[in-house]
Amino acid sequence: VNAYSRITHASVHLPTGRQSACEIEQRLRRHSPSLALPPGLIQRAFGLRERALADPADLPSDLAARAATRLLNTARLRPADIDLLLFAAVSADVREPANAHIVAAKTGLSCPAFDIGNACNGVINALQVADALIRTGQHRRVLITCGETLSRLSRWELDRSRLRTGLTSLTGADVGAALLVEASPVPGITGSVFLANSTSWPAATLYDPHHAPGQPQGLHVDSDALLASFTGLDAQAAQWLKEQDVDVRELDLVCVHQPSQPFVDAFRARMDIDPAQIIPTFPHTGNAAAATLPLQLAQAVHDRRLAPGDAVALFGLASGASGAVMLLRW
């Protein structure tokens, strides 16, 4: 019996559409003429050069299904070879049924399927679930899918009072991603820790218009409050790594959530991570939400940055606030 799990494949679907930081600012000026927006603000504030945009007709499930289909083709697997499909994303086609069923139908899968949601930590929590289900013998192959269309949460009509919580919405990206987790005779997912600071949940909100109609609608992110919500989580993560006898500087690859370049730089400095250990995805893709971590893994595979036996760490950070660290042996 294979008592462990490992990530065996990572795939991504990046739409060809792009919107530059300059184009974002031009559109914002058209819709919010009262703002005296200084040129270059988006790039200076976030480090964004351009973001990925899906075709208007594409839904989150379409992006997820394309990444999943690509993964199955690369792995030379049939739909019948998958035991369980998980969908984990901020974005969604529907509230009912689970979006995983839509992705399964589009990829020809007939296995059980369900959604996992934890803001931008959805995929790393899906890895947690897949690892547990495989270790307990309930499944052998779990396909994790993600489809993000965060560009559609852009708030174009802003005034000075709403600029602080609305500007971040203009950095969201459209990305599809997929990971395959399989039973293994040797450890692949070697350890993980999950953390939370739930009293800070108001820092970033996207209220449901049907069930919370009296609340502010649209994506609202107080960047300062969100950054403060992670205070203490980084220290707990560092302490856990110390207990695992892991020196971050000795890792071959570090994947970290990338909501902005300044955020990545600040997190890297606090965790003593070398810039060369991180693949920067934000500047030319944007904030890919839950697809950010699999995007970096897929990019590392594409660039041949990963070899069998390499030590990898995934750092998840999400509104809520929640934090996670997962250690992998590739």
Predicted segment positions?
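Active-site pocket-shaping loop/turn-to-helix segments
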Residues: L48-R66, F114-N121, T168-L170, P216-Q236, ...
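Phosphate/pyrophosphate-binding loops at sites that engage ATP/ADP/AMP, CoA/4′-phosphopantetheine
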Residues: A67-D83, A235-D252, A300, R304-R305
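Acidic-glycine-rich active-site phosphate/pyrophosphate-binding loop
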Residues: L35-R44, V94-G108, C146-L158, D208-H211, ...
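Short beta-strand segments
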Residues: A88, G117, V142-E148, V181, ...
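Condensing-enzyme catalytic core mediating Claisen C-C bond formation in acyl metabolism
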Residues: V1-P56, L158-L227, R329-W330
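Flexible, glycine-rich active-site loops centered on histidine and acidic residues
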Residues: R135-A173
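Claisen-condensing/thiolase-fold acyl-transfer catalytic domains that form or cleave C-C bonds
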Residues: S61, A65, S91-A92, I102-A105, ...
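Oxyanion-binding "anion nests"
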Residues: D208-V254
